[in-house]
Regions:
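Flanking helices and flexible, charged tails adjoining ferredoxin-like Fe-S electron-transfer domains
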Residues: 51-53, 57-82, 100, 104, ...
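Rossmann-like dinucleotide/flavin-binding elements
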Residues: 83-108, 147-159, 173-176, 190-248
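A conserved short coil-to-beta-strand element within the FAD-binding core of flavoproteins
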Residues: 148-161, 264-274
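General small-molecule cofactor/ligand-binding pocket signal
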Residues: 106, 145-147, 186, 260-262, ...
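Ferredoxin-type iron-sulfur electron-transfer modules and their immediate structural context
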Residues: 1-81, 129, 168-186, 200, ...
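Conserved acidic residues
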Residues: 164-165, 206
Length: 283
């Protein structure tokens, strides 16, 4: 980190990006939506504010991309033929570092584009396709082959094709626990995936309630706010706004988008279109 910060300070943007790529295969993704929890422990907090390393990383990626990309070369081929199942951040990063080490790597993605959750779930107002496309280009520049539109049925299928090693990087798509004891609810990730693929495809009515106080809840609330017909989006959380786990910047953007906050409420269930909650008190 100090090395690329120094390079950026001196105007050596290409050097800065090369330094970042030594340890980070996805500078556009991490430079845009990394939760930057390291900033909470930055020693500069004792004097002024944390170093904005995420923003500097993105600046280096954007400024150095066009010149650095053609310079990235595939390593000499080794005797390893590796298949990576899943073209999300984990799969892409694995492919990048393995191909740099000389492995013959192929990434298999069932969707029509690489990118995983950032591409198909996280709203476009958080990260755009252009940033994801550039990270895919950086990962494939070292020689990894990207195969889209193919779902792998079994590991044996790939072994039969001559792959010596197989990495499964399909993500943790398990549903979260239900928030309500009774009544219907949408799963957050399913909702985000549907509205990103086809905005307006879910009839939400005029009033929407989002339960939770983390970054995903903010994404859901902001995405719901821009759906056709929606007038009010209320975010309900069991504690107060100050104790919400979401990043401060995510809270601010939700407020700016018109999301309303209802604090110290523990949702019980939905009955006849009414959300019933218990009132909480901070301990």
């Amino acid at each position: 980190i100090p090395a690329y910060l120094e390079a950026m300070e001196e105007g050596r943007v290409e050097d800065a990006l090369k330094i970042i790529l030594e340890k980070n295969a996805l500078p556009f993704t991490t430079g845009t939506i990394c939760p930057h929890t390291c900033a909470d422990r930055c020693m500069r907090n004792h004097y002024e504010s944390a170093l904005r390393i995420r923003e500097v990383k993105l600046m280096a990626a954007e400024a150095g991309f066009e010149k650095v990309l053609p310079e990235l070369k595939a390593a000499a081929a080794a005797d390893k033929k590796v298949a990576v199942i899943g073209g999300g951040p984990a799969g892409l990063a694995a492919a990048s570092f393995l191909s740099r080490a000389g492995a013959d790597v192929t990434v298999f993605e069932k969707n029509d584009k690489m990118g995983g959750v950032p591409r198909y779930v996280i709203p476009g107002f958080r990260i755009g396709d252009d940033a994801l496309d550039k990270d895919v280009a950086l990962c494939s520049a070292y020689g990894a082959k990207m195969v889209t539109g193919r779902e792998i049925a079994s590991v044996q299928e790939l072994k039969d094709e001559g792959f010596t090693d197989i990495i499964v990087a399909i993500g943790a798509w398990a549903h979260g626990r239900k928030a309500l004891k009774y009544g219907d609810e949408y799963d957050a990730l399913e909702f985000l995936e549907k509205v990103k693929a086809a905005p307006g495809s879910i009839d939400l009515g005029t009033d929407v309630v989002v339960i939770g106080g983390g970054n995903t809840a903010m994404d859901v609330a902001r995405a719901a706010k821009i759906q056709p017909g929606v007038e009010h989006v209320r975010l309900v959380y069991r504690r107060d706004r100050r104790n919400m786990p979401a990043d401060e910047e995510e809270l601010v953007m939700a407020i700016e988008d018109g999301v309303e906050f209802m604090e110290l409420l523990a949702p019980e269930g939905v009955e006849n279109g009414v959300l019933k909650c218990e009132k909480n008190v901070l301990g």
